[in-house]
UniProtKB/Swiss-Prot annotation:
It comes from Bacillus subtilis (strain 168). It is found in: Cytoplasm. This is Bifunctional cytochrome P450/NADPH--P450 reductase 1. The record marks 271 as: Important for catalytic activity. Keywords: Cytoplasm, Electron transport, FAD, Flavoprotein, FMN, Heme, Iron, Metal-binding, Monooxygenase, Multifunctional enzyme, NADP, Oxidoreductase, Transport. Residues 671-904 form the FAD-binding FR-type domain.
Amino acid sequence: MKETSPIPQPKTFGPLGNLPLIDKDKPTLSLIKLAEEQGPIFQIHTPAGTTIVVSGHELVKEVCDEERFDKSIEGALEKVRAFSGDGLFTSWTHEPNWRKAHNILMPTFSQRAMKDYHEKMVDIAVQLIQKWARLNPNEAVDVPGDMTRLTLDTIGLCGFNYRFNSYYRETPHPFINSMVRALDEAMHQMQRLDVQDKLMVRTKRQFRYDIQTMFSLVDSIIAERRANGDQDEKDLLARMLNVEDPETGEKLDDENIRFQIITFLIAGHETTSGLLSFATYFLLKHPDKLKKAYEEVDRVLTDAAPTYKQVLELTYIRMILNESLRLWPTAPAFSLYPKEDTVIGGKFPITTNDRISVLIPQLHRDRDAWGKDAEEFRPERFEHQDQVPHHAYKPFGNGQRACIGMQFALHEATLVLGMILKYFTLIDHENYELDIKQTLTLKPGDFHISVQSRHQEAIHADVQAAEKAAPDEQKEKTEAKGASVIGLNNRPLLVLYGSDTGTAEGVARELADTASLHGVRTKTAPLNDRIGKLPKEGAVVIVTSSYNGKPPSNAGQFVQWLQEIKPGELEGVHYAVFGCGDHNWASTYQYVPRFIDEQLAEKGATRFSARGEGDVSGDFEGQLDEWKKSMWADAIKAFGLELNENADKERSTLSLQFVRGLGESPLARSYEASHASIAENRELQSADSDRSTRHIEIALPPDVEYQEGDHLGVLPKNSQTNVSRILHRFGLKGTDQVTLSASGRSAGHLPLGRPVSLHDLLSYSVEVQEAATRAQIRELASFTVCPPHRRELEELSAEGVYQEQILKKRISMLDLLEKYEACDMPFERFLELLRPLKPRYYSISSSPRVNPRQASITVGVVRGPAWSGRGEYRGVASNDLAERQAGDDVVMFIRTPESRFQLPKDPETPIIMVGPGTGVAPFRGFLQARDVLKREGKTLGEAHLYFGCRNDRDFIYRDELERFEKDGIVTVHTAFSRKEGMPKTYVQHLMADQADTLISILDRGGRLYVCGDGSKMAPDVEAALQKAYQAVHGTGEQEAQNWLRHLQDTGMYAKDVWAGI
């Protein structure tokens, strides 16, 4: 057990504890001083209780782990609850109204929502500009005062369509006076002794009066909106009054709406006004930074009032704001509590009764994170977001409890500071020295400057300028569209694929989309569709997988044709090949892609780029990305093309329109699937087993036939849990009907152009729990404006990190979206990035000789602790099928594998079957067929089944196998790997013990079948067979390998193992 250390504490003063060390008017400055003396962690005791203050970035990283810590509403925040109640800022995470309001209001603070607020923000900013422009020469500007007026009016107008008209008042609005006094009183209450508090009768009376003043204003805003009815407003108040929480279906009650409005009026203007004031101060004290800011503003803000797009282009202004928040975060601390007793820093014990305060100004000055110049004002440190120190920048709080209005504040502040610099020269006529003023937030105290107009002409900023500019921007964008590749001369690209499970097809369609969006004419098709029709104009790209060394079902005919044509027949064809494979099948890895690549060259085609390989058990996406880069570069060189840098490089976009009606998924058509029904669904494991294996009988449609050894493909349904998670994350309802439209081929799996419910769309069309790809993670990062969170996401796609943190833990894009709530990815883009829902293939475990109208499958239910360490992982198809009941519908199709996995035509041919666990499935069908043949009077060759399981509890089909053995249909050899009192035994061990028998059977022309795990079991079985061959025939290793390969090439050895591509 590790030794713990006491948390440092400054000197105490009797019953007052450390209270005398805290300046009641500027407590944050006192804590900063103590942190400089005590270090990155210390504790203070006051009559109000004990607080652990943390400021070192490594310790902050620990306490910001939301699995271990959550936001605490104590101290000053607890006092603020007197007038903000369970609003977003002052509610506990476990309170129902926090989650409800968070779900309802998140969309109104997204980056996209800022576009709707932009015009109103300009409206208020223009009032500030006009006020300053009308000042007399040398007349002082109260910077914090005017910024407070601006930010209050902005949140009032944008959030509630209420005008405080602060610039038309001689004195602040009564709400402001009451709010400032109430916040100040809340801060001081926590520093007073109970006896002091009781004696302050007048102060308490004023506190109640100020609260009632705020309540009266807010209640009147709500009442007026209700009286006027729905005027199609899209602001905060409209959502609070009209929108239901997608999770509970409930609306916010009027009391909570009151608390939310007060919360936003406080948080929405206090912090932003402080930010603008600090930024102004820093610019005046750093003329070189001010000069750069003026240069950017003059270059970008060319209209009277900035457009939304122009504000986004003010990158240096945003850096100034970020750096101002670093040095003086206007919300200087946030409080946390541990969910259970723990240790931080490897030695400091924290109990559930402790309260932790993250001291943000000191965190932002941590030299270990920010470097030796941490005290300096240097906006350039935010130029490259990937260099912002991890967990060392928290101006908006942490995680799901971070400030919901961050985007609102930053857009408003960027717009306002840009406009100020566009129109005014700032003058520090008083040579101001910074004096921090604190209520619950920080701002410069008594800060005055003077301004001079930078332009002699009168300032007439047009409030509508931003909107008027929009059509022009759109026109420019439309005119810019066109080919981004010069020299195509209408030459096409044909992308062909061979794919059984969808991976290769998905890659092919993505390649076609990419080319199409660069102005290239493209087509996609299965390889079998282009037999004898490879074009000699343009380029051909082939993406294909292998199945045990055999081509996919939609590529087999093409491979055969390619093999039969004469050399020289494909002269003039220009091609490139990318192969999908799995290195666990080393003997056949990339066999088909390699064969196609070599055959094309041999038959006269020209390879314009080297073949690429993607390993689905490795870094498939990284390998694909590298190949795509080189392939496109080679194509440009080979065909004499040039890149048009001025072309529109927009991605394929998916649009979504809400409608009413019904819809269906097109995936069933793409696999020629049919609707069937479940006839029986029963458990095969014993009652005391901790696993689940289902035997499922499926009543087939009239026109569907199968044979033993075939596969039954199932189009599964995503779990309701995961569908609900997505709907909740995006604030949508599953019952809503939408119509999708798309410009690219990669959306072909979606039900385009017809109504479909969001529930059905997410249930039947896309993979939602696959590990996130690097491309998906990069997209998530691009939609995340919170610098620390964006940096975290960007780091996840790095070499090594991606494999360890995403692939091995099977972290999905949905998991990441839930973790990073600041990610503002639109639902349409999320949907577009999800891969098509792939069919799951099961070996049929029955024989049509018993019942041709019914087929069974044997499904091992995948269910267990998630590799991510969070919750339970459930396989999509196996759990979907496990829950189906007799009579339920299932979408299915039959596929005959290319591996010749069928019974010998001559029933007297001896057979060896190896199938542990659910690998026994196809052999059950074989044995049923042999049973029928025997009853028909046919003579059977000997048959051996090597079955494996852990113990008697998961010995599936035991009764049937024992009956087949009793009836002389088969000899069963069972290996138990976890049976008490017996050594651990696998099927290959039993086969090694019976080497003479097995080799004798195979030498006499017997057939060998192996079904099940291809990564471990199948290679071990093959190794055992090769050793047996060596031992029996006295040969070497190479001869044994050649023998086994010959068996496979001649069809005497067939495998039904899964590569997952």
